């Protein structure tokens, strides 16, 4: 017996999150490594830079940006400026809510470590 998994495209399989390989949790620690902050390494292989600007786009994934890039001219220009024409795709946190993803980005930890797995609106 099989069941459809919500949010998984037909023909794809659901994957368990891996916060050690190309993850949102690695972004700011890698940036710190690029900037030679003691105790941090560039685990994403970002390269060297005297300054770094991180741009957060909340909501669309890589697939939506590829399909609707015309609606995001800044991102379209950023992609075009890359030598291979693509930006690096990072995996988000699970669950992929804004609160969980921002806590993962800001702490460099997986949701099970930082404990923010959602939010409540009153």
Can you annotate each of these PLM segments?
Residues 2-52, 59-122:
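Active-site nucleophile/metal-coordination loop of metallo-enzymes that catalyze phosphate/sulfate
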């Amino acid at each position: 017996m099989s069941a459809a998994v919500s949010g998984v495209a037909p023909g794809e399989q659901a994957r368990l999150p891996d916060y050690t390989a190309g993850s949102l949790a690695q972004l700011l620690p890698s940036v710190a490594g690029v900037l030679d902050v003691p105790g941090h390494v560039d685990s994403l292989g970002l390269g060297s830079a005297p300054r770094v600007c991180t741009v957060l786009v909340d909501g669309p994934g890589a697939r939506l940006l590829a399909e609707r890039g015309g609606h995001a001219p800044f991102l379209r220009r950023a992609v075009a400026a890359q030598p291979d024409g693509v930006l690096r795709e990072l995996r988000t946190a699970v669950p992929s809510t804004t609160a969980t993803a921002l806590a993962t980005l800001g702490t460099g930890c997986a949701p099970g470590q930082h404990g923010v797995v959602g939010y409540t609106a009153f």
